[in-house]
């Protein structure tokens, strides 16, 4: 992280926030300001309840308390923080997060109880990791792509475990990936085991903050370990040896630095994106190849299914839109309706 001193304007905002807390709060102040040093810039590399690990400009990590006035703080947030001063007994006081800078992007997921929940901030791109094992699921890739388009965060599709493919299998997978290449998505083929294809991926990650998403068992943790040069930092028991089924391996979102440049936020919250909180129109917009045909259907309320005069259906029949993508579009809509029905039933039951 480069050294960034607070500007005079930022200093004034910190002081103004402090004075406003003193004037408006009827409660006892949450922390004594005399316990802390001068404000500085930092980035949240992990969040634990009412504490956060903040990396300072010199690369050191500081455990910090969080002001009660800060309503939302997640990994990736850029913050103003103050270090704790040594206490009388010689024990260092935790630092404190004073303010959060405006986010350039925020990654969210729906929650049945809390609505939409932020899980990471200031993400430049989402790396969608898939693999031929446990299975190559284009439906899951399409779900991630809809989420990326809705969040307006750039996606990269990475197919892992290519070392397990023979020539025939590679030809088939390339044919499947051409569906995405042809509509403008970047696709990279890699192997975390043999490290084939890692160089182009490293280049795509350099200078950016990325987050890796993928179903359990695709080797996401092993791929991150290969890129980070780690063996134990991120656990690798991605798949059960007995069942072949994926296991969850990490519990808290954390930011790591790639040795070649760039950062990654590893979070269990993005193993799968729920889309049930979206409207059907948002799902439609999430399929980028549909855009040229929207508004051209015979009927304004066209469901893009069996409706007569559907421009999207005609494009599928003419080979301009991949039939697989069109089928997955309707699968996503159907699964959304089912989840919303269960949620509404649960709410009524309460």
Swiss-Prot record:
Residues 1-33 are annotated as: Disordered. One of its GO terms (cellular component) is cytoplasm. GO terms for molecular function: GTP binding; GTPase activity; metal ion binding; rRNA binding. It comes from the Bacteria. GO terms for biological process: ribosomal small subunit biogenesis. Its main location: cytoplasm. The keyword Repeat does not apply. Zn(2+) binds at residues 297, 302, 304, 310. The keyword Cytoplasm applies. Gene3D superfamilies: Nucleic acid-binding proteins (2.40.50.140), P-loop containing nucleotide triphosphate hydrolases (3.40.50.300), Probable gtpase engc, domain 3 (1.10.40.50). Residues 104-273 form the CP-type G domain. Binds 1 zinc ion per subunit. Its cofactor is Zn(2+). Residues 1-17 have a biased composition (Polar residues). Keywords: Cytoplasm, GTP-binding, Hydrolase, Metal-binding, Nucleotide-binding, Ribosome biogenesis, RNA-binding, rRNA-binding, Zinc. GTP binds at residues 160-163, 214-222. Its EC number is 3.6.1.-. It is found in: Cytoplasm. Belongs to the TRAFAC class YlqF/YawG GTPase family. RsgA subfamily. Monomer. Associates with 30S ribosomal subunit, binds 16S rRNA. One of several proteins that assist in the late maturation steps of the functional core of the 30S ribosomal subunit. Helps release RbfA from mature subunits. May play a role in the assembly of ribosomal proteins into the subunit. Circularly permuted GTPase that catalyzes slow GTP hydrolysis, GTPase activity is stimulated by the 30S ribosomal subunit. This is Small ribosomal subunit biogenesis GTPase RsgA. It comes from Escherichia coli O8 (strain IAI1).
């Amino acid at each position: 992280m480069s050294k960034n001193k607070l500007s005079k304007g930022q200093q004034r905002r910190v002081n103004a926030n402090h004075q406003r807390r003193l004037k408006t709060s009827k409660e006892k102040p949450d922390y004594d300001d005399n316990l802390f040093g001068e404000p500085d810039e930092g980035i949240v590399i992990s969040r634990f309840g009412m504490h956060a690990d903040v990396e300072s400009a010199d690369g050191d990590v500081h455990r910090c308390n969080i002001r009660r006035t800060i309503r939302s703080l997640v990994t990736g947030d850029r913050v103003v923080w103050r270090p704790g001063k040594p206490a009388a007994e010689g024990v260092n006081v935790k630092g404190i997060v004073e303010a959060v800078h405006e986010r350039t992007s925020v990654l969210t997921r729906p929650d049945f109880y809390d609505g939409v929940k932020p899980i990471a901030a200031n993400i430049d791109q989402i790396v969608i990791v898939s693999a031929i094992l446990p299975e190559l699921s284009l439906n899951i890739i399409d779900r991630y792509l809809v989420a990326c388009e809705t969040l307006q965060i750039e996606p990269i599709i990475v197919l892992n475990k290519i070392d397990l493919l023979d020539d025939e299998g590679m030809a088939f997978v390339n044919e499947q990936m051409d569906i995405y290449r042809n509509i403008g998505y970047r696709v990279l083929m890699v192997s975390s085991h043999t490290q084939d294809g890692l160089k182009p991926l490293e280049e795509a990650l350099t200078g950016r903050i990325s987050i890796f998403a993928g179903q359990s068992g695709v080797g996401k943790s092993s791929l991150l370990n290969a890129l980070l040069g780690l063996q134990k930092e991120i656990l690798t028991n991605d798949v059960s040896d007995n069942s072949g089924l994926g296991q969850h391996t990490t519990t808290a979102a954390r930011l790591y630095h790639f040795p070649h440049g760039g950062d990654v936020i590893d979070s269990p919250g993005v193993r799968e994106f729920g889309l049930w909180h979206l409207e059907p129109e948002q799902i439609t917009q999430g399929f980028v190849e549909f855009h040229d045909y929207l508004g051209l259907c015979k009927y304004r309320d066209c469901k893009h299914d069996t409706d007569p005069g559907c421009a999207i259906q005609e494009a599928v029949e003419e080979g301009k839109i991949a039939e697989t993508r069109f089928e997955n579009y309707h699968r996503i809509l159907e699964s959304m309706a089912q989840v919303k029905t269960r949620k509404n039933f649960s709410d009524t039951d309460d």
